[in-house]
Amino acid sequence: MIPRKPVSRVIALEEAFLHPRVWDLYSESLRRKYQPVRARLNDVGTGRIRLMDAAGIDMQVLSHVQPGIQMLADAQAELAVAVCREVNDWLAEAIAAHPTRFAGFAMLPTLSPRDAADELERTVRDLGFVGALINGHTNGRYLDDPAFDVLLARAESLGVPIYIHPTDPPTPVSDVYYAPFESALVPTWGWPVETGTHVLRLICAGVFDRHPDLKIIVGHMGELLPYCFTRLNVGLTMAGWLLTPESDNQAMRNNVGHYLRRNVFITSSGVFDVPVFDCARAMLGLDNLMFSVDYPFQDNFAAMEFLRRCDLAPDDKERFAHRTAETLLRLDNRPPATRAAATNFGDAWYGLRARTQSKVGRALISALVKS
């Protein structure tokens, strides 16, 4: 018996593309890194949709692959503004061609925080984007830097989240922590530590007290934060960081858990382990968890098999797969009309991949993608 898709709708939130204008700005090392998946990154049309259909994924929220334009020097702020506008307009056209299959996170010129805030507002109000994705720090400046308050306030007022995606740590940190093993340790360990630290900086700086309705998303099942939840909750309070009558010089008005549960959402991008999911659910609650793949660096079918294996009641699985994302991103919660005719087709291919890794199965899927 071929297993059917485990839920009625699936939305994936950390799904990358690559724009030619940004490719032209990338260094040779970045080009070598992305060359093996460049064709898939470039495709925001029918080829990508065929792969989504084959796995049973209804919608991708698209964002530019890291580091976007955040690798530019501080003196290139005007270039960053122009490139972001060009890329976001291009993405809006791709979404308009397939509005039931794609949504968009804006790429922002964080070299100039006020311009970043203005571009966020433009893309949300004029282009219908559902938030922004920022690749960690910008030349060593994190979002708790007071200069970024204008951007955070704008996101809060617009009611859209900011997705913080991993990037390499600042070079001095990487040199001390990871050399000479950077290529192995930075993507696997350095990125989660870097991104989890970014969120903790926001908490300790009082960002969520100043902006209580601001929402942040992080991927990879929480970037180590759920695992460290209790230690952070207890440790920062014991260290006197919590604002109390006896310690009134710190900015944090509540414990860490309060902010993680109120202001931070996490996705399953690239982490398809049920025990890790169970830890995140226990620490943050299911309402803070959303499905993602991390395409094209992770496999759509592996992500869907993980979704099938999650030990959730049917309604809870629907929340994780799409309902929480629909609410947070204010997406249309009706199943896409274009999906209805392909449901049985997509279920069949999902079942084929879930059931077998044979050469025949791979050949059939390859033929589907190329057709």
Mark where each language-model region is.
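Aromatic/hydrophobic pocket-lining residues that form the small-molecule binding cavity
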Residues: 45, 84-88, 116, 120, ...
